[in-house]
């Protein structure tokens, strides 16, 4: 009987983890298309553009006794490989750099958040938007 209980526990633990990570409510960390905004205070317009960013679920843990042990670092969905692309803001006055660079995700991974190249905050209620009049969107993939 003990052997049967052990086997049942092993099956539940092993298949439960795989099922939870593949569920439709938890898409794994991957590149997705996102629309972002680019503007410069000195230029009269804002451009929205579509690029690829990293988004999705990364497995994490929370300690049962948080006061007794140091916190566990929580992984975030972040860039593994990326390249940079640039767009030119139209209508900028002379002497103002009209170029805006942005990252394009080629592949993603779950890892520690590095504030030097990632926004580690949670989901936003409102997407990043333009303060200036927008031009029609561009597509950069």
Curated annotation (Swiss-Prot):
Any single Gene Ontology cellular-component annotation: extracellular space
What positions does the record give for glycosylation?
33
Q: What Pfam families does this protein's entry cite?
A: Cys_knot
**Compartment annotation:** Secreted
Name the predominant localization: secreted
Q: Which family does this protein fall into?
A: Belongs to the glycoprotein hormones subunit beta family.
The source organism is Ailuropoda melanoleuca
Q: What name does UniProt use for this protein?
A: Lutropin subunit beta
One MF annotation (Gene Ontology) recorded for this entry:
hormone activity
Query: According to its UniProt entry, what is the function of this protein?
Result: Promotes spermatogenesis and ovulation by stimulating the testes and ovaries to synthesize steroids.
**Which InterPro entries does the entry mention?**
Cystine-knot_cytokine, Glyco_hormone_CN, Gonadotropin_bsu, Gonadotropin_bsu_CS
Detail the disulphide connectivity of this chain as listed in its UniProt entry. Answer: 29-77, 43-92, 46-130, 54-108, 58-110, 113-120
Q: Which gene encodes it?
A: LHB
- PANTHER family from the entry? GLYCOPROTEIN HORMONE BETA CHAIN, LUTROPIN SUBUNIT BETA
Subunit architecture: Heterodimer of a common alpha chain and a unique beta chain which confers biological specificity to thyrotropin, lutropin, follitropin and gonadotropin.
């Amino acid at each position: 009987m003990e052997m049967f209980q052990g086997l049942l526990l092993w099956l539940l633990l092993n298949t439960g983890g795989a099922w939870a990570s593949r569920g439709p409510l938890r898409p794994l960390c991957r590149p997705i298309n996102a629309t972002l905004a680019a503007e410069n205070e000195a230029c009269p317009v804002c451009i929205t553009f579509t690029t690829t960013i990293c988004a999705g679920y990364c497995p994490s843990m929370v300690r049962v006794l948080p006061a007794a042990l140091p916190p566990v670092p929580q992984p975030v969905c972040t860039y593994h490989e990326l390249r940079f692309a640039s767009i030119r803001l139209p209508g900028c006055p002379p002497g103002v750099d009209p170029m805006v660079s942005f990252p394009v995700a080629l592949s993603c991974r779950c890892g520690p958040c590095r504030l030097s190249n990632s926004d580690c905050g949670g989901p936003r209620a409102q997407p990043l938007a333009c303060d200036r009049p927008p031009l029609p969107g561009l597509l950069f993939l």
